[in-house]
Swiss-Prot record:
Gene name, Swiss-Prot/TrEMBL: PLAAT1
UniProt-listed Enzyme Commission number(s): 2.3.1.-, 3.1.1.32, 3.1.1.4
Transmembrane segments: 139-159
One Pfam family recorded for the sequence: LRAT
Active-site residues, as the UniProt record annotates them: 30, 119 (acyl-thioester intermediate)
Protein name: Phospholipase A and acyltransferase 1
Residues in the Lumenal compartment per record: 160-168
The LRAT domain, residue ranges: 20-135
Example of a GO biological process term: phosphatidylcholine metabolic process
Family: Belongs to the H-rev107 family.
Amino acid sequence: MAFNDCFSLNYPGNPCPGDLIEVFRPGYQHWALYLGDGYVINIAPVDGIPASFTSAKSVFSSKALVKMQLLKDVVGNDTYRINNKYDETYPPLPVEEIIKRSEFVIGQEVAYNLLVNNCEHFVTLLRYGEGVSEQANRAISTVEFVTAAVGVFSFLGLFPKGQRAKYY
């Protein structure tokens, strides 16, 4: 199942090893990968800031630490769902391979970039062998749109108000 249809605030479902876990934080989603026995693998800022405060810190971080933690500790007071949303586009690796790859990187410091190498990229790389992030793609599109809009308005600002109509 690519998406957990039984998702609710009270019962997000029982994850299986290799499942992607989407944690809903205020203003963004954090991603982890379920390993089994209540544990997940995820990345967090190197200085060990609690999970609920990592958003602001991660914007300025260039490094992250790969951690194996209890799912309940990563989620904290937030909610989560099982969301293997890329399964139709990228076939998942065998579970044994996902777990082996995950165990290999636990405790390592990795490069981090909010737009090109974030927590969603990290867990999708483990599950599919390819780092993908819809959240980052949306952010990049927003930045591109704002940049283009600023450019247009800056360009229009070069012309006196009366001359602008002549160029349309």
